[in-house]
Amino acid sequence: CYLSERLMLDARENLKLLDRMNRLSPHSCLQDRKDFGLPQEMVEGDQLQKDQAFPVLYEMLQQSFNLFYTEHSSAAWDTTLLEQLCTGLQQQLDHLDTCRGQVMGEEDSELGNMDPIVTVKKYFEGIYDLLQEKGYSDCAWEIVRVEMMRALTVSTTLQKRLTKMGGDLNSP
């Protein structure tokens, strides 16, 4: 299973959509800013092995989709842009799903306990916590939008890294 250029194009389009969703000046929301502990070094360094990189990428995209595909999110954003973003994230997940069974196979049940996956889940828990603490305010969503741009940039970096690893997710 090979990662396609389509996956990278979808990723870039999703980043553009997030940028267009900007409704407030991020500077007006600095008081709500929080370090969510984006595990960037995990992606950019050599901490992830090839067999871990795919599940981490999948988890980041799935969690991103889940975050924006909610009732609270629908109330916060322009519906058209939000739908386009969710569609783009779903397209990325669908593409990865074609590889998922081949790559993960029987190990799938163990991946939920894999340290990098747990790190990604904790990262998104922090994002949900901020939204709840701030009552899903416009500023909270703006902080989340900016943070998700960082997260999707990291996901894109991980996709590039997987491609450099050969793109064939079945090879050792």
UniProtKB/Swiss-Prot annotation:
InterPro entries, per the entry: 4_helix_cytokine-like_core, Interferon_alpha/beta/delta
Database matches in SUPFAM superfamilies: 4-helical cytokines (SSF47266)
Keywords carried by this UniProt record: Antiviral defense, Cytokine, Disulfide bond, Hormone, Pregnancy, Secreted
UniProt cross-references to CDD domains, sorted A to Z: IFab
Cell compartments where the protein resides: Secreted
PROSITE patterns documented for this protein: INTERFERON_A_B_D (PS00252)
Tissue specificity remark: Constitutively and exclusively expressed in the mononuclear cells of the extraembryonic trophectoderm.
Pfam families reported in the protein's UniProt record: Interferon (PF00143)
CC per GO annotation: extracellular space
GO biological process: defense response to virus; female pregnancy
Gene3D superfamilies cross-referenced by the UniProt entry: 1.20.1250.10
SMART domains: IFabd
GO molecular function, one term: cytokine activity
Note: IFN-tau genes are intronless. They evolved from IFN-omega genes in the ruminantia suborder and have continued to duplicate independently in different lineages of the ruminantia. They code for proteins very similar in sequence but with different biological potency and pattern of expression.
The protein's role, per its UniProt record: Paracrine hormone primarily responsible for maternal recognition of pregnancy. Interacts with endometrial receptors, probably type I interferon receptors, and blocks estrogen receptor expression, preventing the estrogen-induced increase in oxytocin receptor expression in the endometrium. This results in the suppression of the pulsatile endometrial release of the luteolytic hormone prostaglandin F2-alpha, hindering the regression of the corpus luteum (luteolysis) and therefore a return to ovarian cyclicity.
Family, similarity comment: Belongs to the alpha/beta interferon family. IFN-alphaII subfamily.
Identification of the protein by name: Interferon tau-3
Source organism phylogeny: Eukaryota, Metazoa, Chordata, Craniata, Vertebrata
Gene: IFNT3
